[in-house]
């Protein structure tokens, strides 16, 4: 087995190079910024490619040595991807709210995990019939709450050996706890992130769904590679195992030419109704397509412009919007 392959083209198609609006940046990320386009910082993918390779190598090495990797991503667009990648690679995850002390107060967290397992026994064992309806409801609610918070680490059995983090701004408590304990951190850093203290920084968009899917898929496959290497070191023949690990199918190709939809506005959404012919209903359709800013419309090529027009029911109108959007973007700068 080997580390998963990826290309700069894949990163481009996933929108990894799109940073935040230029006024929403952390100057410490300047070394990773290629330039500005339509008031959006563009990340230098020539640095992302080797940085991502180093992070994947760290994941593979950690797992090969019997270590645990903890995926951390609690923002909405990362929750499912993080959980799926961790499960697929036999690792661990936190995709709900990060509980303070989840690393630095592991003993208390362990007690909560033990309580979760006890509740499962109480609600599924022979004694379940001894509870009243109200008692079962109370116990079920407690179990669901613990499962949501701790389900991804219930079998971790101790502190992780490496954290993989999506969005260090949102997961700042997790990062600080890892740094305090000397646990290495591999993290996706957008242009508004702080790279200080990150062991394996990977400059890239941390909001776009397709970018997050790509990161999680690559890290999961790197962990699977580490499992394979670990088995080889132990003399285990993977071909004889009953259920070999699967690396999964590649992501679907993008339906867009160069446009990268956003899962939500970056900061405050622009008032797209300023564009000629854009009613509140049309603005909502644009939002549903992942369009929230004039800069996105200004950057559309002819293929994507035609598709946007067809999707909102105004074919041929988008070319005029592009010209207007460029003017509005220039005014914002």
Swiss-Prot record:
Question: Domain of life of the organism in this record?
Answer: Bacteria
Name a GO molecular-function annotation.
Answer: structural constituent of ribosome
Protein's GO biological process: translation
Keyword Ribosomal protein recorded: yes
Q: Which residues form a coiled coil?
A: none
Record key words, sorted: Ribonucleoprotein, Ribosomal protein
Q: What would be one Gene Ontology cellular-component term for the protein?
A: cytosolic small ribosomal subunit
The record's InterPro entries line, in alphabetical order, gives:
Ribosomal_uS2 (IPR001865), Ribosomal_uS2_bac/mit/plastid (IPR005706), Ribosomal_uS2_CS (IPR018130), Ribosomal_uS2_flav_dom_sf (IPR023591)
What HAMAP family would the database entry show?
Answer: Ribosomal_uS2_B
Q: State the similarity comment.
A: Belongs to the universal ribosomal protein uS2 family.
Q: What is this protein called?
A: Small ribosomal subunit protein uS2
The source organism is Azorhizobium caulinodans (strain ATCC 43989 / DSM 5975 / JCM 20966 / LMG 6465 / NBRC 14845 / NCIMB 13405 / ORS 571)
Source taxonomy: Bacteria, Pseudomonadati, Pseudomonadota, Alphaproteobacteria, Hyphomicrobiales
State the gene name recorded for this protein: rpsB
